[in-house]
Amino acid sequence: MTPAADPGQGILSRMTETTIGIGGAAESTDMVLNIGPQHPSTHGVLRLRIVLDGERVQHAEPVIGYMHRGAEKLFEARDYRQIIMLANRHDWLSAFSNELGVVMAVERMLGMEVPERAVWTRTLLAELNRVLNHLMFLGSYPLELGGITPVFHAFREREELQAVMEEVSGGRMHYMFNRVGGLKEDVPAGWAGRVRDAVASVRSRMDVYENLVLGNEIFRGRTRDVGVLSAAAVHAYGVSGPIARASGVDFDLRRDEPYLAYGELRDTLKVVTRTEGDCLARFECLLEQTLNSLDLADACLDRMAHLAPGPINQRLPKVLKAPEGHTYAWTENPLGVNGYYLVSKGEKTPYRLKLRSASFNNIQALTELLPGTLVADMVAILGSLFFVVGDIDK
């Protein structure tokens, strides 16, 4: 007779071994966190897929395309007059500069010389548009870090400049004032004086950002040595604009490959750089560049006051066709380098118009910036890249 099996032995054999720990001995797994596509800290529908180990970011991947509207394909179904209306919409904070790049590419294909009066007016409007763009980020970036006051100052300054832009073009954001061969029409009587007053008024209040934002120890603590982008990463990802210059990359198309009237403004044009490459350096570059753009606007007004009366555009045929061929035009947009690759088959619509938008390249640097940082610093780093989602997705 065999002895009865002990029931406790069967229970023990079925038990699994579990390690229990607390604090540093606790077993942990990485967590995947989705930021967006609808999130208060993003400028539009950007999604970030972040892998976290505790409070540290291990991996970050920007997921783009939620605002893609097929702008490049739409260009192929519009003639050279109509694409100006589409070109200023993907980066709604830099509308004039986007129009400018397209018409410069078409003018280069046509071998067209633009009247001097149009060249200087374009330069003035481009710098005013740059100030409008930068003021938006000078106000919104502190807001993302918890400082609500600067954004009210920024919108007050923007309103003064938007008033003169609206007076000359009829639009507050989408100007549609550029034309192939020049501008839509000459500026109204007395407009230059009103621009000079608006520029002086904005300049007189720019010390608010120096004192209220840069003088705030909490802001400096949240941004100094946070999100450091190396010069090597700038070159690797094709980063441009104030973000690249904050990392010590001394490159600005207005100086290095002048277009419009920038070749004659070398004494006034100042390329602002920093070497730290952190969030604070990027904000400082943006602020100082805004002040320089106000100086450039004054220099343009001084030069325009001594121009002889003349045409503001070229007479064009009823049906405008670019000759067969291809060309590339690029401009120093407020957010960085924008490129326009135009291919023509000799028809009234472009065969292909490829956009190289600054925000698309700049946002790729997040895969380099975010790993190793704290989740709490993610918003500070993201906001310091000064991007527009429409400019990424096109």
UniProtKB/Swiss-Prot annotation:
Gene Ontology molecular function: any one: NADH:ubiquinone reductase (non-electrogenic) activity
Name the chemical reaction catalysed here: a quinone + NADH + 5 H(+)(in) = a quinol + NAD(+) + 4 H(+)(out)
Give the record's membrane topology. Answer: Peripheral membrane protein
Q: Which domain of life is it from?
A: Bacteria
Q: What is its EC number?
A: 7.1.1.-
Q: Mind telling me which InterPro entries this protein's record contains?
A: NADH_Q_OxRdtase_suD (IPR001135), NADH_UbQ_OxRdtase_49kDa_CS (IPR014029), NDH1_su_D/H (IPR022885), NiFe-Hase_large (IPR029014)
What keywords tag this UniProt record? Cell membrane, Membrane, NAD, Quinone, Translocase, Transport
Enzymatic class: translocase
Pfam families noted in UniProt: Complex1_49kDa (PF00346)
- Quote a single Gene Ontology cellular component term: plasma membrane
| Disulfide pattern | none
The task this protein performs is described as: NDH-1 shuttles electrons from NADH, via FMN and iron-sulfur (Fe-S) centers, to quinones in the respiratory chain. The immediate electron acceptor for the enzyme in this species is believed to be a menaquinone. Couples the redox reaction to proton translocation (for every two electrons transferred, four hydrogen ions are translocated across the cytoplasmic membrane), and thus conserves the redox energy in a proton gradient.
Q: Which family does it belong to?
A: Belongs to the complex I 49 kDa subunit family.
- PANTHER family linked to this entry: NADH DEHYDROGENASE [UBIQUINONE] IRON-SULFUR PROTEIN 2, MITOCHONDRIAL, NADH-UBIQUINONE OXIDOREDUCTASE 49 KDA SUBUNIT
Q: How does it assemble?
A: NDH-1 is composed of 14 different subunits. Subunits NuoB, C, D, E, F, and G constitute the peripheral sector of the complex.
- The protein, known as: NADH-quinone oxidoreductase subunit D 2
